[in-house]
Amino acid sequence: MCLAVTVLALVGCGDSTLSSKELQTQAEAVQSFAAEGALVAKGVEQARMTETFVRVHTDYLAKAARKVETELSSKQASGSLDRKREDAARLALLVSLNLERLHRHPGDQALARELGSELEDDAAAAEKLAK
């Protein structure tokens, strides 16, 4: 969770033009949120987490991912960097929506299995965007 807070602090800085380094930082943030969400989902699937923990933590992660999506959507970039910015913003939104679903159904093991797999895929996609 400390990593997520540090990443959020870095994500909020800058002007309206997105640099390659900022995109990398934000994509890494999305990767972090998705990977952490996948771990929570795995815990739900294996009945190792309380519903209260799942609700609180997925709410935090979903809001953090949504903040990154908002930041990316408010920035501008040119050429291929703008396409990557759009892809990262869509991915941040998808991560946020998946985390919100887990938040609403913190004890649903079947849904957790599905979302865990999706969040792992999202984390891999975000890692690729960060390169």
Task: Tell me what each language-model feature is.
Residues 100-109:
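Membrane-helix boundary connector in multi-pass membrane proteins
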Residues 22-101, 114-129:
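Alpha-helical segments in soluble extracytoplasmic regions
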